[in-house]
Amino acid sequence: MSHHRSVTALAAGVAANLALAAVVAGAQAGPSYLAVSGWSAGAVGPSNVRLSATTNGAIPKRADQFINDNVIVGIAWADLGTGTALVATIHPTLGRDSHQRPDSWHLHTVQLAGGATAPNDFCLVSVNSTPTGGIAIQGDSMTINLAASKLPDAGEGPISVGDLDAAVGFTVHGGDAGCVTGLGVRVRT
């Protein structure tokens, strides 16, 4: 089975748990470490990129209570034109899906779409890859060092760092009837 199909199967298998988590998380305000106050993305040499995000609070290196109470928590750098994003996520309640830091922050590329129902902002269509990259967390800053070839693929190869339009903190919630997968993405500010 391909990685893409196994991730889709995993998403379907936890839908009931996600729906319960959505009810719990919907009443919670997002923590300051998910409020992105500044970000950057640029090339580092001919084949590597560096993405960074600064938030309004210290980013925990391990799961805190908010992370444990939500199925997926993350910071995303997104190309809004194609709906693709590189996300740094942490999701101990969902389980392991990465060989790099499976119990802590790790990377995925994802495809997003519109159609989510409030209070969600986007639909999570698919998790496309789990690239390996350097993740540094220092206080309120997260920096990602990655091969440019590992950026999200919008159908014609990886996007460039110049295609990235936004960086945001987010949580993922199940039970969104507006999303084909049932998975809604809520931007946290």
PLM segments and residue spans:
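Short, hydrophobic/aromatic-enriched beta-strand segments in well-ordered soluble domains
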Residues: 51-56, 142-148
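Surface-exposed, glycine/proline- and aromatic-rich loop segments on solvent-exposed faces
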Residues: 33-113
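Acidic/polar low-complexity flexible segments
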Residues: 152-189
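Bacterial N-terminal signal peptides that target proteins for export
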Residues: 2-14
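Short, solvent-exposed, Trp/other aromatic-anchored flexible loops in extracytoplasmic proteins
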Residues: 103-112, 141, 147-152
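C-terminal region of N-terminal signal peptides and the immediate post-cleavage residues
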Residues: 21-31
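Bacterial N-terminal signal peptides
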Residues: 12-22
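Short helix-loop boundary/capping segments
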Residues: 114-141, 145-146
